[in-house]
């Protein structure tokens, strides 16, 4: 099913449902200006995610990205306070499954967060970066949107430690099957004995 969204010139364009909620979120915000008023169920989801690991299962267009933005704002405020008290920088990772989603979600986050957001994908060469290059990015940015495999390889190669991450958001978590990087994160880092 498709719907109508605003294109770059403000003209109406047909968008698939998967892009509608993001298009609305982008169209109705100023850069760094904040998000629309969340609905009650989104606030409940945010509160749950704030307290523990959460998988949000909602229909397309129901505002999962808005919940992620609320959670990021909360985590980033905590991070800013810790950094002000001399703590080592930690970064939130928003993981996606495609380069298209890297651009889409990083645009949404830039429009709704006051802190620096980076976006990385394979053709930028992050798999060739050394630890020093990653450390520079972790110092500069508070949120990184990237394809899941980039973070997976960076962790495996020791360029990033799990202790340098304050939040992992899996966009389209239904991909967490078999050998997908999402499944590997859950197995290697999130499942505690």
Q: Could you tell me what each predicted segment is?
A:
Residues 10-57:
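Conserved pre-motif I regulatory segment
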Residues 43-54, 62-86, 187-190:
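Walker A/P-loop NTP-binding motif
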Residues 51-56, 88-92, 141-142:
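Pre-Walker A (Motif I) flank of P-loop NTPase domains
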Residues 60, 65-70, 86-111, 149:
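Conserved Walker A/P-loop ATP-binding site and its immediately adjacent core
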Residues 79-88, 110-113, 135-139, 158-163, ...:
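Conserved catalytic network of the ASCE P-loop NTPase/AAA+ motor domain
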Residues 93, 106, 113-128:
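Conserved RecA-like helicase motor-core motifs
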Residues 126-144:
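Conserved motor-coupling elements within RecA-like helicase/translocase cores
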Residues 141-144, 148-152, 156-193:
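SF2 helicase catalytic motif II
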